[in-house]
A protein has these predicted regions:
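Short acidic/polar segment at the start of the alpha1 helix of CheY-like receiver
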Residues: 11-15, 105
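Charged docking surfaces used in two-component/phosphorelay signaling
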Residues: 16-24
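Acidic, metal-coordinating helix/loop segments flanking the phosphotransfer/catalytic sites
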Residues: 31-49
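Acidic catalytic/metal-coordinating carboxylates
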Residues: 34-37, 60-64
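Active-site residues of response regulator receiver
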Residues: 53
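Receiver (REC) domain active-site loop signature in two-component systems and cognate sites
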Residues: 56
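Hydrophobic/aromatic residues positioned on beta-strands within the core alpha/beta folds
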Residues: 82-83
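C-terminal output helix
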Residues: 103-116
Length: 117
């Protein structure tokens, strides 16, 4: 069974790019456009890893991360921050890795494979 990755980003072209790339690399994907939606998808889909943009409307990635780490079932889900704003990763205490947009696909894939296989 393929590992599942939740892609959280408010930019539809980024979501499409990442989900297509991850599916082509052998992973299942699900997605959300903001932190509020992401928390619902996270609870339903129980992905093996989350890629997280931090600056989004409605609910930020930072708030989503705080809510996720308070949930006993979800708090250990690995998170990779993908942000267009340098230094924003500091708002997330323990990401597996941080990537700035535009994304280095090879490095991202290597990090994912090292983290969840």
């Amino acid at each position: 069974m393929a590992k599942k990755i939740l892609v959280v980003d408010d930019e539809p072209h980024v979501v499409k790019y990442l989900t297509t790339f991850l599916q082509d690399s052998g992973y299942e994907t699900c997605s959300a456009a903001n932190g509020e939606e992401a928390f619902v998808v996270l609870k339903q889909e129980k992905p093996d890893l989350v890629t997280l943009d931090l600056q989004m409307p409605n609910e930020t990635g930072t708030r989503f991360y705080r809510n996720m780490t308070k949930d006993k079932e979800l708090k250990d889900t690995p998170v990779i921050v993908i942000s267009g704003i340098p230094g924003r990763h500091l708002a997330v205490s323990k990401p597996i890795a941080v990537f700035e947009k535009p994304i280095d696909r090879d490095a991202l894939l290597a990090t994912i494979r090292q983290t969840i296989g």
